[in-house]
UniProtKB/Swiss-Prot annotation:
Keywords: NAD, Oxidoreductase. The keyword Methyltransferase does not apply. It comes from Drosophila madeirensis. InterPro entries: ADH_Drosophila-type, NAD(P)-bd_dom_sf, Sc_DH/Rdtase_CS, SDR_fam. Belongs to the short-chain dehydrogenases/reductases (SDR) family. It catalyses: a primary alcohol + NAD(+) = an aldehyde + NADH + H(+); a secondary alcohol + NAD(+) = a ketone + NADH + H(+). SUPFAM superfamilies: NAD(P)-binding Rossmann-fold domains. Substrate binds at S138. This is Alcohol dehydrogenase.
Length: 254
């Protein structure tokens, strides 16, 4: 899929991986890049505009933990402004297993709520045009970092939720896939808390192993968006992009 003249809404598009991905996206000659994030970063927005002045870059403050009704209201404003949204990227995430409720609220519930809200506009059963959802998971959604089971569990939930969305595409007209970064050098992983402090040095130990840069991750992130494969589970690790085949151990039969 060419991203030329597409309208993309990027939740958390100013974070570590998020900002580098936004930089790559504007190079693709989008029509609009709408960034929703908790904290404004005028310098980053100005940089994105300077990279490609042909792309309209807009920022709206957004906390993914707000009720669905508030998200729907914000999306209504965005649709009124740019008329169509082609791709929604759900990228909000925190890594801190001391904050159990917030980890689940940001990493999973917020993603589900944002998705639910945009279906109000996209669902073909309501006359909508359909759309594409790219959800950011993590390799911990396949195999946990067991010292951070809350974070890992939230990312496993993202993978399963998104796989379900993909199978619902014939009904809703909305396709979906996950991009799942491996350990990436961002502020997220430099220091974080394990669950019940089971491993106080978890961040330090993790960074002893091979990692990738956020730029490497961002480049493969955008490649995955361009490949636009419904139901794909993409692994973005050590500068590579790989489609994961999920092993089926059970089937509902419906």
């Amino acid at each position: 899929m060419s991203l030329t003249n597409k309208n993309v809404v990027f939740v958390a598009g100013l974070g570590g991986i998020g900002l580098d991905t936004s930089r790559e996206l504007v190079k693709r000659d989008l029509k609009n890049l709408v960034i929703l994030d908790r904290i404004d970063n005028p310098a980053a927005i100005a940089e994105l505009k300077a990279i490609n002045p042909k792309v309209t870059v807009t920022f709206y403050p957004y906390d993914v933990t707000v009720p669905v009704a508030e998200t729907t209201k914000l999306l209504k404003t965005i649709f009124a402004q740019i008329k169509t949204i082609d791709v929604l990227i759900n990228g909000a995430g925190i890594l801190d297993d001391h904050q159990i409720e917030r980890t689940i609220a940001v990493n999973y519930t917020g993603l589900v709520n944002t998705t639910t809200a945009i279906l109000d506009f996209w669902d073909k059963r309501k006359g909508g045009p359909g759309g594409i959802i790219c959800n950011i998971g993590s390799v911990t959604g396949f195999n946990a970092i067991y010292q951070v089971p809350v974070y890992s569990g939230s990312k496993a939930a993202v993978v399963n939720f998104t796989s379900s969305l993909a199978k619902l595409a014939p009904i809703t007209g909305v396709t979906a896939y996950t991009v799942n970064p491996g350990i990436t050098k961002t502020t997220l992983v430099h220091k974080f808390n394990s669950w019940l402090d089971v491993e106080p040095r978890v961040a330090e130990k993790l960074l002893e192993h091979p990692t990738q840069t956020s730029q490497q991750c961002a480049e493969n992130f955008v490649k995955a968006i361009e490949l636009n494969k419904n139901g794909a589970i993409w692994k973005l690790d050590l500068g590579t992009l790989e489609s994961i085949t999920w092993t089926k151990h059970w089937d509902s039969g419906i």
